[in-house]
């Protein structure tokens, strides 16, 4: 599917059990933030067009908690996942600066 985000869009941390997902940047820039089970960030994948030197295509093949932060005014991705998504996603509270 094609997804277009506007800066300020809120994508809460979530994961997809039994699913893989891949993202391909069409335009704009965004970060994929991965979290551990306690809600602490473990990795940030900065995505952008090839000329930007950032990651163009990202694939996640495990049920890892993740969120998206839009870095440009707009960003569009082609997202591919296997199967249908459940109506309700798992969510985790994000821990900021060591506070819960």
What do these predicted ranges mean?
Residues 6, 51-53, 61:
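Residue-level recognition of short, solvent-exposed, well-ordered loop/turn junctions
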Residues 12-14, 32-34, 58-60, 66-71, ...:
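Short beta-strand His + acidic residue motifs that chelate non-heme Fe in jelly-roll/DSBH
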Residues 18-38:
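Glycine- and acidic-residue-biased ligand/ion/polar-headgroup-sensing regions
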Residues 1-13, 19:
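A short glycine-rich, His/Asp/Glu-containing loop-to-beta-strand
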Residues 37-52, 67-100:
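Double-stranded beta-helix
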Residues 16-18, 46-47:
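"Short basic amphipathic alpha-helical interaction patches in structured regions
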Residues 2-4, 22, 57-59:
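Conserved hydrophobic/aromatic beta-strand scaffold that supports enzyme active sites
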């Amino acid at each position: 599917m094609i997804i277009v985000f506007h800066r300020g869009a809120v994508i809460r941390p979530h994961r997809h059990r039994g699913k893989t997902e891949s993202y391909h940047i069409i335009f704009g820039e965004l970060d994929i933030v991965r979290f551990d089970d306690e809600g602490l960030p473990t990795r940030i994948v900065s995505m952008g067009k090839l000329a930007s030197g950032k990651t163009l295509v990202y694939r996640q093949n495990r049920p890892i908690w993740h969120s998206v932060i839009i870095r440009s005014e707009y960003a569009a991705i082609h997202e591919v996942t296997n199967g249908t998504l459940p109506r309700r996603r798992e969510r985790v509270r994000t821990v900021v600066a060591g506070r819960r």
